[in-house]
């Protein structure tokens, strides 16, 4: 493949953008990333005219692929032509909120913002105000946006900021615990329960190698929060309206969080975030309460129209059946390939998420119980050795994925996530043929 166009654009970008990009993950692979020109269904065409099967899908927002359905396109164009924004409330905000509240059981009220980061920042502030406490429990290695409260590393006894520019005092109010370890969570509650405002957790660790929860884990977190008067916050920025359909991952796992953060799909491909939950908490945001929250572009009419029409399309068409079936085909096909070529690796994912984690092991392949992606099943021959937390994913061959595997996939005409941690995403515009070609590319690249 010729990549001179991308190389040239990257050289230009380096002179005006830090690292040549506007989000760090986009800089992969080095020495230069692929620059997109336009999307086409489940594919992307780059600056040199190369066509790729695209499993990045904007890192999650594009459940319907790169082509907007006719009604979605019409709604967006209509809103833009009527004046893109007003600085005043509009009916489309109310309609979108009503749709979400009807379909997500735990959401009685919602506040729209502009990004997943903004949503989690606001959710943490809200939890602290509602409980009168300071500490937030998070999962080690998890990601909840570019915010000071959750950019931490270490463990409960030795926590530090994970980025330059964050005072140590911020980290002191955050307690990292391993995902899938209820005893570790219980221990920090026994030590700090009177000052824990909330537990903030992705129902599936989709930002850290798609780690699936063990049976009973979320129930344990729910019980701890109830026992100590803390709030349970589900970060569904990635899983929301993708895992578990319109009821989201909380519906799939039958868990009732107090607060949920949303992003990505809820905006139909446009910048968005949202904080939803019980009325007693959400109405504490200003102006009805004392927890300050505001934003010039919050509830942007174009974004609201795109998000609402996306969710309505999902409700009326076979979107979830289609993407989940292709996800199953990918995971099972990858399990067969990995068993033959790299049995120490782990196939992960659920619904329309998939990935291969380059785990190190003794070569024992995943069992039939986890052929459709690791489920932390005790019936699997690899139970207890597959990744159960972000730490396990970090211990995988992350460098080999970035240096060798992903560049080879690009040359095979397939775009997969930029690193070992981000998910791959199936869209409604992907086809069975895309799946077959992708599996063949994996055979070559592995």
From Swiss-Prot:
Gene Ontology MF: a single term: transaminase activity
Cofactor: pyridoxal 5'-phosphate
Signal peptide positions (record): none
Main location group: cytoplasm
Similarity field: Belongs to the class-III pyridoxal-phosphate-dependent aminotransferase family. HemL subfamily.
UniProt KW keywords: Cytoplasm, Isomerase, Porphyrin biosynthesis, Pyridoxal phosphate
GO biological process, one term: protoporphyrinogen IX biosynthetic process
Gene transcribed to yield this protein: hemL
Annotated protein name in UniProt: Glutamate-1-semialdehyde 2,1-aminomutase
Protein localization: Cytoplasm
Organism: Natronomonas pharaonis (strain ATCC 35678 / DSM 2160 / CIP 103997 / JCM 8858 / NBRC 14720 / NCIMB 2260 / Gabara) (Halobacterium pharaonis)
